[in-house]
């Protein structure tokens, strides 16, 4: 048990370190291309900080563990929205732009609804009963993700100012090396992280789903947490908001899309990524978090996630964790 815990911590450390290198390198490249702060957060940083989730979920899918692959994403998005945004808002309220309210936040809600519909295969409406995300579903998700990335870059190109050029003086070759080194650390660390977490769960007779939506989800979301806290401290709320929205959308469309396509079922298991381990509470909390961000734009202070609303997000997360422990 002690050995597995040490491997788990070492794997997590590599994942977080790798993500840090990847984000720094990607941000340097993005700023040299003249992208706006929000678009950097939404795309490069958002997707970069989701790389741990990609490694963990893809590894789970390749090993035929659907609970790890699916639970990690559902848990990660819940952690991102309720805990990270809630905690970040406590540090400094997050202002929202008109585009955030009209386009970006609704896209997060739509993506979440798509996950529920595709994952449950319309069983909520009495049609179909396999509760899996098939390879075809995964391909559809990846096509939607490609369209989303194209739209984000096309609509978010910003003129590079002298100030931003002076601020980002890092060398391009160093940034590329950081990206490659970060990916290597993420892949190796993620593999060890999944193996040790699964072994610990089985030693303690704890379900893979519980481990996935708590330890794995929280652990792989550490890059998002660190990024958002630093962004809030530096008064870069748009970077923090873009990071979470981009991460959540990327988790669903890119990571679950790739995982569904690559999934190798174990003998006797469904042919697609099974959502049988997910309950209405899990998916309901996931959707609630997406809706709460949108609702906060229309409350008393308007287009701002303030400390009161951040506290509501944190209270919702605490309630969900309590429910998980009660139903362990």
Language-model segments: what does each one mean?
Residues 1-328:
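Hydrophobic alpha-helical segments, chiefly the membrane-spanning helices
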